[in-house]
A protein has these predicted regions:
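Active-site glycine/GP-rich loop and adjacent strand/helix microenvironment
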Residues: 1, 6-8, 133-256
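Nucleotide 5′-phosphate-binding alpha/beta core
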Residues: 1-70, 76-110, 117, 160-167, ...
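Intrinsically disordered, low-complexity boundary segments flanking structured domains
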Residues: 24-29, 37, 98-101, 125-132, ...
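Short, solvent-exposed polar/charged micro-motifs at secondary-structure junctions
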Residues: 40-45, 123, 227-229
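Short, charge-rich amphipathic segments
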Residues: 81-93, 111, 131-147
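A short secondary-structure junction signal
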Residues: 81-83, 123-125, 178
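Conserved AMP-binding loop of ANL adenylate-forming enzymes
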Residues: 96, 100-132, 141-144
Length: 256
């Protein structure tokens, strides 16, 4: 019923989807009574369409309170996405239950984050290369200044702020761990490292695990909040069906 209500909402209030439905002869009544077996009849939305219309005709005329965020850009150019406040709250709870809980950590533990937010200009090579958010006990590390010359400052941020677990871009967390190892430095033992946004290879996982002496957990989906795939304590990548219905299609839009 929630899915039907959402589809009707897009027909009534979102110009982009209403036009797409009508071009295929899909009417409001069909959406109000759609069955799971009929989902394949709905048009899919491409990343290019999301980039082009995400801040215009894809927005609802009855927009609830929220804000714009950028996706990680792991598949190319970052996408500008509007996030309603209530969606952020619900997805935060899901992340706590299905990602952090499975990794044995929580949002109240001091954490380190390596993401796309620019906390200082890329050209500015002045310490520190992190900022501390006292309210969330979060140390936000710059993803744009990681190098052999700066890694000692990253390690200092982890130690001084008593970081218990790390999260963020897989490649950035790997580079931090790799440079720490190559510099012969010793990192504190963490509870877990949770990666996202980029492919985590076996080599990357091993080096991160060796340096921080903890398990590494992979996860996918965040900013878009349209699904959630996370790694369990058994090392399985699992889709959370209560977050959203996930369909797998190839580059031609055919089901696989």
């Amino acid at each position: 019923n929630k899915l039907r209500a959402l589809l009707v909402h897009t027909f009534d209030t979102v110009p982009f989807y209403r036009d797409k439905y009508k071009s295929l002869g899909i009417e409001r009544e069909f959406l109000a009574n759609i069955r799971l077996t009929e989902l394949k009849l709905l048009p899919y939305t491409t990343k290019d369409e999301l980039r082009k219309y995400g801040a215009s005709t894809m927005l609802s005329s009855s927009l609830s309170k929220g804000w714009f965020e950028y996706s990680s850009g792991s598949t190319g150019t970052p996408v500008h996405i509007y996030v309603p406040e209530y969606v952020a709250q619900v997805f935060s709870a899901l992340m706590e239950n299905r990602v952090r809980n499975w990794a044995g950590v929580s949002c109240v533990m001091p954490r380190g984050m390596v993401g796309g937010r620019r906390i200082l200009p890329k050209s500015k090579m002045q310490k520190p290369f992190y900022r501390y958010n006292i309210f969330e006990k979060q140390t936000y590390f710059s993803a744009y200044h990681i190098s052999e010359q700066t890694v000692e400052n990253y390690l200092r941020g982890i130690v001084e702020n008593k970081v218990e677990w790390m999260t963020g871009y897989a490649m950035s967390n790997y580079f931090i761990a790799d440079f720490i190892q190559k510099a012969g430095l010793k990192a504190p033992q963490l509870r877990a490292v949770i990666t996202s946004s980029e492919k985590l290879t076996l080599e990357m996982r091993q080096i991160i695990s060796d340096v921080f002496r903890c398990k590494v957990f992979d996860s996918y989906s965040g900013c878009e909040a349209c699904g959630l795939i996370s790694e369990s304590s058994l090392g399985e990548l699992l889709v959370s069906p209560d977050v959203g219905i996930m369909e797998f299609i190839n580059e031609n839009g055919d089901y696989v």
